[in-house]
Amino acid sequence: MSRADDAARALHEHRRAKTDPLLDEAVKPQDLDEAYAAHLALLELMTADGGGPQIGWKVGFTNDKAQARNGATEPVFAGLLGGNSYVGEAELTSPRGTGLGVEAELALRMAQPLSGPVSRQDAAAAIDAVAIAMEVVEQRVRVDEMGLVTMIADGTQQYGSVIGEWNESIDPLTLDQCDVRLQVDGLTDGFMPATEVLGHPLNALTWLSEALGRYDLALAPGDVVLTGAIVPAQHLNPGQMAELASDGLGDIRLWVD
């Protein structure tokens, strides 16, 4: 077994035991390549454990502040699993009773395969629908304790997703003109433009295509891509509700128990 496989098994056990995902030096990934290899192995373990199938990918750290805060020099990616993806609304229980985070994002649905370096126009042509989405995140341990490579291996705090109704009429090239409004318990916590995501949400997709190509992976028709936080993560305590809305894309909701 490789170090990446050992790291994946250890992280999987931490998830099942609901313990902090801290790794011994003997199995901790040594670089980004090992971190992503461990994450891909973890996705296989989680799928076999009933969490799958994989339905796509998320892109994270899509602005300079997020990258600086987490010690990264570029965005990151992680897999999305169908077992914790919901349509329109969801009611989720906080695993540790401390609440969950929610990020306001856009979701893209792929119509064509995509891999390696591509232009924004190529990326737009490969998309057949757009939706608003929430990425649900769980910060199980502080970033400075975990470290970037372990965070990537563990899925970059990914806990689940809520995806709105797919809109097939929007031109993906115009997504930089989209605004979203995130409310928590009826109070607006953020109203932000999609340009918060690398200047244009499609830049997240072009980055992801190139990054996946480094590991001989590709986006496939039907894959869902979360493009990164437009409104930064807002914490929801048990009993709170978040609502995300955008003109032309409808609204979605999340309750935390």
Map each language-model feature to its residues.
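Catalytic-core "active-site belt" of small-molecule-metabolizing enzymes
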Residues: S2-H200, N237, M241, D251-D257
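Short strand-turn-strand beta-turns centered on an Asx-Gly dipeptide
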Residues: V184-D185, T227, D247
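A conserved acidic, glycine/proline-rich C-terminal tail/linker
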Residues: A204-A233
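Short, charged beta-turn/beta-strand-edge "cap" motif at the junction between a beta-strand
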Residues: I230-Q234, G248-D251
